[in-house]
Each structure stands twice: as structure tokens, then as C-alpha cells.
Regions:
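Alpha-helical transmembrane signal-anchor/signal-peptide segments
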Residues: 37-55
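N-terminal Lys/Arg-rich, disordered targeting/topogenic segments
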Residues: 1-11
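Active-site-proximal structural scaffolding
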Residues: 21-25, 51, 193, 218
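Hydrophobic membrane-insertion alpha-helices, especially the h-region
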Residues: 17-33
Length: 235
């Protein structure tokens, strides 16, 4: 009986500790959001409508527009969708950059949710299967963070294969983990009054299982795009 009582006592203390931690977290969030982050900052930036469509040997025939409902669902403030072509490669590379001026839920939530949607969650819903998924160091010139990481995926739909790179580029950071994105949004909201950020994604076809050429095409185009991004995605 003594052992049972002792076990119940320990379980009770553990429950109290968890409750206190939860309450402390709620209080800290309330204080942070309502006192330290009362006046959000929105850095100056250029609109993606001004982004150059010719980058050396790479060219894009024109920016692609998404329908308004999709834009609302994604919560993007501004975006760029472009299919870059180069005569040296037998396909185009899809480049998407979605900029969110704020990632704070608007009053009432719902359609006011502005946080960045992880591509790994959306791809299966559009019919693509993720057959390889890894986190890699993204050592490409033009990035603000030389220690940044990206998600590298191989996706498939029927016989089609694609190489996908994506990462979150927000307030000078380059990160791939969803939980880090959430943590830094809260931290920067409190300390810098900023929650702006972007999702950057490159999608490259893989033909005849030639993943090496797809990788080379990505490494060829990416530095040219990234060198121009600071004007559109502020550090």
C-alpha cells in the first residue's frame, strides 16, 4: 500500500509541475505578445513584379499568377512563380518565392492565418509522393546565412520525378525545420517586432533518372536568383 501511495504522490507532483509549466508558458506568451510586441515592424522591400526575368543564360517568359483563392489560402503578401529555361538543360525549373509580411494570426483566425505552409504537408494532397526527404546544408552564394539548411526531396507522380529544394528564409535566417520557424517567429516578434518571412522552393524535373543533371541545373540557377533576393526578402 505504501508503494502505491508513494507512486500516486509522485504522479500528483508531476501533474502539478506540468500544470505550473503550462501556466508559466501561457503567461510568458501573453506578456511577450501584448507588451513587448505591440507595434509590428514591416521592412521596406521591392515587389516581385519588378524581379528580373533574364538572369544570364536563364530566362523566364513571364511571372505566373495564382488564383486569388489560392493566394488567400496560402496567406502570402507577395509572391513570385517563374519557370526559368536555359538552352543547356532540356527542361524548365520552377521557382517559387512566397513572402509573408506578417505571420501573426489575425483576429478571428480562420482565413486570417498567415503562417507559411510547409510544402512537405501540401505535396501529397496534390498527388505527389515524397520518395526521399533529407535535411542538407545549403552552401549557395547569395544566402544570408552560410550555416543554413534546406529540405532536399525527390517526389514522384506516376513516372514523373522531380528534385525539390525548399527552405524558410526569414529575417536573415535560412532554416528548414518547421519547429525552428515557429520558435524564431515568436522570438523575433518579441525582440525585433518582426514576423515577416518567406518560403523559397526550386522544383527541377529528373529525366531518365539523371538526378545529377537536375542537381547541376539547380546549382547553376539558384545563385543567380538568390543574389537578387535581399531586395525582395529583407534580412
Amino acid at each position: 500500500m505504501a508503494e502505491i501511495v508513494a507512486g500516486e504522490d509522485r504522479a500528483g507532483r508531476s501533474g502539478v509541475i506540468k500544470t505550473l509549466v503550462a501556466v508559466a508558458f501561457i503567461v510568458a506568451n501573453f506578456y511577450t505578445y501584448h507588451f513587448l510586441a505591440s507595434t509590428p515592424k514591416y521592412p521596406d522591400r521591392q515587389q516581385f513584379s519588378e524581379f528580373p526575368l533574364h538572369l544570364d543564360e536563364w530566362s523566364c517568359p513571364g511571372l505566373v499568377s495564382m488564383d486569388e483563392q489560392t493566394r488567400i489560402n496560402l496567406g502570402v503578401t507577395d509572391y513570385m512563380i517563374c519557370r526559368f529555361a536555359n538552352a543547356a538543360y532540356p527542361y524548365t525549373i520552377d521557382v517559387y518565392v512566397g513572402y509573408h509580411a506578417s505571420q501573426v494570426r489575425e483576429e478571428g483566425g480562420g482565413a486570417g492565418e498567415n503562417s507559411i505552409h510547409p510544402p512537405a504537408h501540401c505535396l501529397p494532397g496534390s498527388g505527389w509522393d515524397i520518395i526521399a526527404n533529407s535535411t542538407v546544408r545549403i552552401d549557395i552564394p547569395g544566402l544570408p546565412d552560410p550555416q543554413g539548411t534546406a529540405k532536399r526531396m525527390i517526389i514522384a507522380k506516376g513516372k514523373a520525378r522531380r528534385l525539390v529544394y525548399y527552405w524558410y528564409q526569414s529575417r536573415g535566417r535560412v532554416i528548414s525545420e518547421d519547429w525552428k520557424k515557429i520558435v524564431y517567429v515568436g522570438l523575433d516578434r518579441a525582440l525585433r517586432q518582426r514576423t515577416d518571412g518567406s518560403l523559397i522552393r526550386f522544383t527541377i524535373p529528373i529525366e531518365r533518372n539523371d538526378e545529377q543533371t537536375s542537381e547541376r541545373a539547380f546549382r547553376d540557377l539558384a545563385p543567380r536568383v538568390l543574389a537578387l533576393l535581399p531586395a525582395y526578402v529583407p534580412d
